[in-house]
UniProtKB/Swiss-Prot annotation:
HAMAP family per record: Aminopeptidase_M20
GO CC annotation, single: cytosol
Cofactor list: Zn(2+)
Keywords: Aminopeptidase, Cytoplasm, Hydrolase, Metal-binding, Metalloprotease, Protease, Zinc
PROSITE patterns given in the database record: ARGE_DAPE_CPG2_1, ARGE_DAPE_CPG2_2
Protein name as annotated: Peptidase T
Main location: cytoplasm
Disulfide bonds listed in the record: none
Textual note on the cofactor: Binds 2 Zn(2+) ions per subunit.
Major enzyme class: hydrolase
An example molecular function term from Gene Ontology annotations: metallopeptidase activity
Provenance organism: Streptococcus pneumoniae serotype 2 (strain D39 / NCTC 7466)
Top-rank taxon: Bacteria
Length: 406
């Protein structure tokens, strides 16, 4: 089905810079997310028919579409995030490519291009309307496509009261991209039987397995002396960082893994001879493997300190989120419903693990099973991001279909 307001709604959203900031100590991490929620989303939530709309101190904009049939007693939620990834989001100037011809798309005057030779996903979209960047920013389809799709579905349900539905709760939250947005999610306030994040990628994605995730912060304390008299005295903190890294499995890196394979990912190294720091993320699907990875890093640090004769390597491990499969497999109802709806719509469900996480990874462990469905974005988190309008329309169809089926 086509939805006349979907494209304009999406274009309005992506033009607002809502980039999150991992170094911030506030919630949300950026004022722009607060402004987007209060000045753009909340007024529109009211316009499309949501009631009891409010903004919580945790950064979530919440609204309710009351049940229009008292016999439908379930309560369901739909959730998307407002923030965008750590890439330029100022001055987003989307291009709308109607009836895509399958050829190279020039991204404005930036010199960058979307070439099917480099991005095979483009081969799926001839004849469709694509929204791209101009090559200077990301697009923000992750996850403003999800917000636009949820908003459009609510608008449609409000305009069609003949579609009987249970109570629907909507939540638009902050800081998903930096992994902290759902930390303060109020599950008791949201109060639904189950929910869906609309935060997936291509058509048909239906996901209930995520990584379990941890962060590792390492501090290496060296001892700097003049290199001319360094023998037996100098301890080079940068060399300690190298030595630590070289003891991790050589092939357990993101660029060498896929499917259910986990990894260690070195994100950042800074320092000098005197002092160095390194940041890693740790990812795996199975709980035992996840715990083993953390234990391995601690073992390396302990071994190095023993060999050095002092505690020059300090490791701080922080769990970030866990594989929501552990929760959702106890009751697969949300998956069964979404899968059946997609199949009825002629969409082939793609049920595979997310090599990442969603807000649902945390919300599921708060007592609300929250799998993830597609929102349409491709090549997310950078200048090559794009989305198909037709896929977005199918996401709206899926949301409405889920509501109809309850």
């Amino acid at each position: 089905m086509t939805y006349p307001n979907l494209l304009d709604r999406f274009l309005t959203y992506v033009k607002v810079n809502t980039r999150s900031d991992e170094h911030s100590t506030t919630t949300p991490s950026t004022q722009s997310q607060v402004d987007f929620a209060t000045n753009v989303l909340i007024p529109e939530m009211k316009r499309v028919g949501l009631q009891n709309v409010y903004y919580l101190p945790n950064g979530f904009a919440i609204g309710t579409l009351p049940a229009n049939d008292p016999s439908l007693t379930r309560k369901i939620g739909f959730i998307s995030h407002m923030d965008t990834a750590d890439f330029n989001a100022e001055g987003v100037n989307p291009q709308v490519i109607e009836n895509y011809d399958g050829c190279v798309i020039e991204l404005g005057n930036s010199g960058f291009k979307l070439d099917p030779a480099d991005f095979k996903s483009l081969e799926k979209y001839p004849g469709q309307t694509l929204i791209t960047t101009d090559g200077t920013t990301l697009l923000g389809a992750d996850d403003k496509s999800g917000i636009a799709e949820i908003m459009t579905a609510i608008e449609y349900l409000t305009a069609h009261p003949e579609i009987k539905h249970c109570e629907i709760r909507v939540g638009f939250g902050p800081d998903e991209e930096i992994g902290v947005g759902a930390n303060k999610f109020d599950a008791e306030d949201f109060d639904v039987d189950f929910a869906y994040t609309v935060d997936g990628g291509p058509l048909g994605e239906l996901q209930y397995e995520t990584f379990s995730a941890a962060g590792a912060e390492l501090h290496f304390q060296g001892r700097n002396v003049h290199p001319g008299t360094a023998k037996g005295q100098m301890v080079n903190a940068l060399q300690l960082a190298i030595d630590f890294h070289n003891q991790l499995p050589e092939n357990d890196r993101p660029e060498l893994t896929e499917g259910y394979q986990g990894f260690y990912h070195l994100m950042d190294v800074t320092g000098s001879v005197e002092e160095a720091r390194a940041s890693y993320i740790i990812r795996d699907f199975e709980k035992d493997a996840f715990e083993a990875r953390k234990a391995s890093m601690q073992s390396i640090a302990d071994k190095m300190n023993e060999e050095l004769g002092s505690n020059r390597v300090t490791l701080n491990l922080t769990d970030q989120y866990y594989n929501m499969k552990e929760v959702i497999e106890k009751d697969m109802t949300p998956i069964t419903i979404a899968k059946a709806v997609m199949e009825d719509l002629g969409i082939t469900p793609i049920i595979e693990p997310i090599r990442g996480g969603t807000d649902g990874s945390k919300i599921s462990f708060m007592g609300i099973p929250t799998p993830n469905i597609f929102a349409g974005g491709e090549n997310m988190h950078g200048r090559f991001e794009y989305v198909s309008l037709q896929t977005m329309e199918r996401a709206v169809d899926t949301i409405i279909g889920i509501v109809r089926s309850l």
